[in-house]
C-alpha cells in the first residue's frame, strides 16, 4: 500500500448496504460520487463510532478491490467526507 492521498472533500453517498450486528443492522456506504465518478465498494468494511461532544461521528474504511478509502460520516450534520485514498500494491 502506498502513502494515502489526503482528500478531505465532501462527497455524496448514493447507495448503502446493511449488515447484521448484535444491536440490529449497521449501514455502510456502498457507492459514492467523487470527482464526477461513481466509486462502488465491496461489501466488506470497517466502522468505528466516535462521540465528539454532541456530535456522533462514524469512520469507515472501505475498498473497491484496488484502493482503500477512509470516509467520515457526521451523523448530526448528515455530511460525508472522503478523507483519504490509498492505492493497494
Q: Would you name each region that the model predicts?
A:
Residues 1-89:
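Cysteine-centric segments in proteins
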Amino acid at each position: 500500500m502506498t502513502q494515502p492521498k489526503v482528500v478531505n472533500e465532501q462527497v455524496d453517498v448514493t447507495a448503502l448496504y446493511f449488515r447484521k450486528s448484535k444491536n440490529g443492522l449497521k449501514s455502510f456506504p456502498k457507492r459514492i460520487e467523487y470527482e464526477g465518478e461513481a466509486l462502488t465498494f465491496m461489501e466488506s468494511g470497517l466502522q468505528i463510532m466516535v462521540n465528539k461532544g454532541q456530535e456522533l461521528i462514524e469512520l469507515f474504511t472501505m475498498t473497491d478491490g484496488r484502493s482503500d478509502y477512509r470516509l467520515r460520516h457526521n451523523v448530526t450534520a448528515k455530511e460525508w467526507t472522503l478523507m483519504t485514498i490509498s492505492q493497494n500494491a
